[in-house]
Regions:
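Surface-exposed, charge/polar-rich loops and edge strands
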Residues: 1-444
Length: 444
């Protein structure tokens, strides 16, 4: 069963939160962080992207860079830009994107739950990335940024969240860049704290949605500190790391699409012909558009030329609407691809995934792309950027073809994690991303 605890959060005063908060460290590069921070000395980028405190070109892995993160964390606290709460408490973090709100509980997750598999993962981690995050946690002696967890829907917790959502939040702002609304509440009532702890204790598992390297680093540093402490009791703060936990049904996973530089020596005609072995290939020259319905409420469809449909409804009307369907853009034309029966196994939580089908039968078998992490011929485009970005990169000549996929579901992720298997690379794109700087967890 999952163990969580409240903690004394370190966070900005209400009037400074929009100056401090930032995007997470791993969604932008050093130049972008430098530009976004500008002359704002209160920006969290000075802690999570500390290479911006040095001359451009300074390696983010330079020992001075890590020390700069620690120095700035101390400076932020000394200047009152970050203050630690007096009481151990939970927090609620809500994000609203396109009119849909998801509510997360900010908790201290138990390091041992990660080590024993109560906290379940679905991605492999790289040791070099783990070590980078471990160095950052060590020098700051804190989890500066949270990990993103999912948990099975829970009516008791949902009622508690909705009760707080009806009250005035501690923070409430529209973030730059993403344009989404972010709200934050403090849960200091002892009864509510006890309820949250008790409800999590009933859950057999928690699931890492996003932040596998941060989770691994936090857990490894916690275990490291326990080993180094001769008076270790198991109650120390380093036995926990900061996570924002959302109900699984509330989470939005967007499509994570592929663009490829070449056709592995094939002509376009040869490539399309090769696809017919495992897919039904449809040249999309017209589109059935669902209208509002007739007088009896029965849906009506109108067949429209593809250019007219795109002009009226936008490119995203072409997105794959069901599992095992794909959208190909090649030589200025759109094609629908539908996996034939027998090309996937519904009983296999990995083999049934569209990311696996496309990787096996298109990228590997036809295009010779065997390692999605390292092959320079392929790149990935998060669904928030839309099909327009796929079209742009192909039309520009940078890429030869684009492949759009139906998004993975949270249930599929949980099924894979429960089976102990690992998702294929570049399979999930969660949106909105957690903002950093709203809350920090110190390890002492």
């Amino acid at each position: 069963m999952a163990i969580v605890k409240p903690f004394k959060g370190v966070r900005p005063p209400k009037n400074l939160v929009e100056l401090v908060e930032s995007r997470p460290y791993d969604v932008l590069n050093s130049e972008e962080a430098r530009a976004e921070a500008g002359d704002n000395e209160k920006s969290l980028y000075h802690i999570i992207k500390p290479e911006i405190n040095f001359e451009p070109g300074t390696s983010e892995y330079d020992p001075r860079v890590y020390e700069s993160a620690a120095e700035n964390f101390r400076k932020f606290q000394e200047n009152g830009w970050l203050k630690q709460d007096d009481k151990e408490q939970y927090y609620i973090y809500a994000q609203t994107m396109n009119g849909k709100t998801q509510y997360g509980l900010v908790v201290g997750a138990y390091v041992n739950d990660y080590m024993t598999g109560v906290i379940k993962k679905h991605e492999l981690t790289r040791r070099d990335k783990e070590e980078d995050r471990m160095k950052h946690v060590r020098v700051c002696n804190a989890n500066i940024e949270p990990v993103f967890f999912a948990y099975p829907d829970n009516e008791v917790l949902n009622e508690l969240l909705m009760r707080y959502a009806a009250t005035s939040p501690e923070y409430d702002f529209i973030a730059p860049i993403d344009g989404f609304r972010h709200q934050f509440w403090v849960v200091s009532d002892d009864k509510d704290i006890a309820t949250i702890t008790a409800e999590f204790a009933k859950m057999p598992s928690l699931y890492i949605a996003d932040g596998h390297h941060r989770s691994a680093a936090a857990a490894l540093v916690g275990a490291e500190k326990a080993k180094q402490n001769p008076n270790h009791t198991g109650k120390e703060e380093y036995n926990y790391f900061m996570a924002v936990c959302f109900q699984a049904s509330q989470l939005t996973i967007l499509d994570y699409n592929r663009v490829v530089k070449d056709l592995n020596g094939l002509t376009s005609e040869q490539f399309l012909d090769a696809l017919t072995k495992n897919f039904e290939v449809i040249d999309i020259d017209a589109f059935n558009v669902k209208l509002s319905g007739d007088e009896e409420g029965i849906p009506c469809y109108e067949k429209m030329a593809i250019d007219d449909a795109i002009s009226q409804f936008g490119l995203d009307i072409l997105k794959p609407a069901a599992l095992h369907s794909f959208l190909l853009y090649l030589d200025g034309k759109w094609y629908g691809l539908f996996a034939k029966p027998g090309t996937y196994d519904d009983a296999d939580p990995i083999g049934v995934l569209d990311v696996d089908i496309s990787s096996r039968l298109i990228l590997d078998e036809i295009l010779g792309i065997k390692d999605l992490r390292s092959d320079k011929r392929i790149d990935f485009v998060g669904g928030l950027r839309g099909l327009g970005e796929l079209k742009r990169r192909v039309d520009s000549g940078e890429m030869k073809m684009a492949l759009a996929l139906h998004p993975v579901s949270m249930q599929q992720i949980m099924d894979i994690a429960d089976s102990g298997k690992i998702m294929p690379p570049k399979a999930t794109w969660f949106e909105p991303k957690l903002r950093s700087g709203l809350i920090i967890h110190k390890l002492d």
